[in-house]
């Protein structure tokens, strides 16, 4: 997932993988945001597309994330939980900002935080989905 969302003031698309590697190499803690990629890594989008089309990249990412949802189902986990576990399992991620809208989503995130980190095999399988 590479959508930066509706942020319109960035003139060049950042390379999240390069930034992540630089932070890891330089021992810089990472604050993870958009762990569920504005809803793309959840079971369903909870909103309609904006008439201006400004959130089209988020909806495109949702379509591209179908293999991710299938993998979450195979592992008997919700897509949102798996996305948060992936973020929490990433080397040098110190915190994850949650984008929850209700207490049910908050509870799921808190439950996820108490789960074990993903093992290397699962992390590799997830990375292979989008490379």
Feature names for model-found ranges:
Residues 1-131:
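Beta/alpha (TIM)-barrel catalytic core signal, keyed to glycine-rich beta->alpha loops juxtaposed to Asp/Glu
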């Amino acid at each position: 997932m590479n959508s930066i969302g509706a942020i319109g003031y960035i003139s060049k698309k950042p390379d999240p993988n390069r930034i992540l590697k630089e932070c890891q190499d330089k021992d810089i803690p990472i604050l993870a945001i958009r762990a569920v990629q504005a809803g793309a890594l959840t079971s369903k989008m909870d909103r309609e597309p904006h008439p201006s089309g400004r959130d089209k990249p988020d909806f495109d990412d949702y379509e591209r994330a179908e293999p991710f949802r299938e993998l979450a189902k195979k592992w008997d986990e919700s897509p949102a939980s798996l996305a948060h576990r992936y973020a929490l399992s990433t080397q040098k991620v110190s915190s994850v900002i949650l984008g929850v809208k209700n207490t049910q989503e908050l509870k799921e995130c808190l439950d996820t935080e108490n789960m074990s980190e993903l093992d290397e095999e699962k992390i590799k399988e997830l990375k292979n989905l989008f490379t």
